[in-house]
Each structure stands twice: as C-alpha cells, then as structure tokens.
Regions:
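Conserved catalytic motifs of ABC-family nucleotide-binding domains
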Residues: 79
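Conserved ABC ATPase "signature" region
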Residues: 36-54
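H-loop/switch region of ABC-family ATPase nucleotide-binding domains
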Residues: 119-120
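Catalytic Walker B motif of ABC-type/P-loop ATPase nucleotide-binding domains
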Residues: 83-86
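A short, surface-exposed alpha-helical micro-motif characterized by mixed small hydrophobic
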Residues: 125-127
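Conserved ABC ATPase signature
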Residues: 58-62
C-alpha cells in the first residue's frame, strides 16, 4: 500500500491537519515510525516541494498552489514508488503550473518516482511527459510518446481532446 501515493485535484479535499507539519506527518505517524524518522520524512518531503519555510504555518493560511505542494509532500513522506495525481495544475496560474510540473519532472528524474497524472491540459504533455495514454470513457485508445499519440488526429477528436499548441 505504500508503493502508490495519490494526490487529489482539490487540496482542500486532502488536507485536514491544522498545520503543514502535522499534515505531512500524518501518514508516517500511522506507520508507527519513530519520532526521529517521522521528523526526517517530514523535513525531507517539505524540502523536496519547496515548503520548508512554511512547516509551522496553518494550512488555511496557504495559497491554493502551496496547498497542492503540501499534499504532494504528505504523499512523499510515505516514500511511494509511484505518485498518481488528479489534475495537478487545475486552478493554478501559469507560473504555478510551471512550478508544479517542474517539481513533478524533478521527482521523476532525480528521485526515480514514477509520475502518473490525469490531465485535460494537453499542452503540458509534449513538454513534461515521456509517455502518455489517451483515454475515453474508461478505455485506453492509445499509448506512446506525445508524437506517436498526437499523430492520430482522429483518435484525438474521438477522445474530445485538442492537439497541443506546439503540435
């Protein structure tokens, strides 16, 4: 169960503890880890997502983008091999989108975490993703690189998607 971590689309549906540190510590605490190991995991996860300076802040005092980062940190504190995210850029301004997508790419490239995300924002795909799957009504229509998948415009239209701007 620790191999896969899930991050919800809306961080307000995932966060529940009063402070950032308490929220990120929740998962490791429930694993029965030592206080030192929990503190180490919390510090490491907050550092990975750039939220170390906010560790003692109230969750309610954070911006939407900061809350998304805390959700990711909470999952990272569980040391997953796979991170599944539902619309991680939803509700973010362009700078926030770039920041979150860069973070996810770094988690994959530097830490070996497999990133799986659901998104309708096809413009992100060629820039940040090595492989993708196009789904429609629960069925996988095509799997491959962005170039392979987006070369079949009929399938893209069938899935009610548009081609990325850079395609």
């Amino acid at each position: 169960f620790q191999k896969v971590g899930i991050v919800f689309q809306d961080p307000n549906d995932q966060l529940f503890a009063p402070s950032v540190k308490e929220d990120v510590a929740f998962g490791p605490l429930n694993l029965g880890l030592s206080k030192d190991e929990i503190a180490h995991r919390v510090d490491e996860a907050l550092s990975l997502v750039g939220m170390t300076l906010h560790a003692n802040k109230a969750v309610d005092a954070l911006s939407f983008g900061q809350k998304k980062r805390v959700c990711i940190a909470g999952v990272l504190a569980m040391k997953p091999e796979i991170l599944v995210l539902d619309e991680p850029t939803c509700g973010l301004d362009p700078a926030g989108v770039t920041s979150i997508m860069t973070l996810l790419k770094e988690l994959n490239e530097r830490h070996g975490i497999t990133i799986i995300m659901a998104t309708n924002t096809v413009d992100l795909v060629p820039v940040y993703m090595d492989r993708l799957a196009i789904m429609y009504r629960g069925n996988i229509l095509r799997v491959g690189t962005a170039e392979e998948v987006f070369s079949n415009t009929d399938e893209i239209k069938h899935a009610c998607l548009e081609l990325p701007q850079i395609a």
